[in-house]
């Protein structure tokens, strides 16, 4: 059970991206005795304890304090009739959030007895923090980045943090920032219609249909990372020295994969999302309206020999407009640049990249 003897509120609540409050802390946990003596927060050191900032203990996404909703407008052409439909947009994980959470917790748990694994994981976290200093400069403060960097450096030195039971205000700040940066790293996110509009959403599974959205190279890296994380999770309780050596080698491979990923959030467009596939084996992601797939007539006369999807009409689905405000689930405020979204930092490099103008259709098709 969490034991907070004395802690300032700012140590518990981090406001990132204009109103994003990080989860896992309830108002009932806060002791309103700000200003009293005390060096930090007292926690029981239990793997997976609900209120231990070392661990990611909740599936819940950050709550949105200002009711921002990300929407996208779809142009639909059916039987030569063009209509416009606004749908809720969402950021979709490719490597599932649950896998990232379980992997993170497993590394921290094993870190006490396997410091080399923790040190290697620290390299990944430091890489993400360094990227955040460039990509999220408008949505995360320098002090929070410094706190996160200190945590990553502690891990790189094989230190689980402090004396195992007490964390300073800066460590709590850094841990919550690190956890968010890891579970929402940009290369693992693509933007498209909300799950309720998808007919092939994988739920808590790996997003196998994202290859055409993020590109083959990044997809292959993410698939490799996913497989390595799952293998690590499955062996997290092993005490065998041989397996520990293998797990460390896999962790080293993950460092290279993380560093090779593009540091952008990808947006789905007409080519990689909305054009219906010709074959079941096509890797495009599909969208449906009114609870069914309206634009595809599935003919399966002689299964499994004939697996062709026949288009009754050629339908063109195009992302027309996407707001540049940050949604509550990610630190980055995106900007449309053809098929990619970049952080507002690049405004200083190329002002043309930072615009609220509606992109032309040919820009979205490139």
From Swiss-Prot:
It comes from the Viruses. This is Putative protein p9. It comes from Acyrthosiphon pisum secondary endosymbiont phage 1. The lineage of its organism: Viruses, Duplodnaviria, Heunggongvirae, Uroviricota, Caudoviricetes.
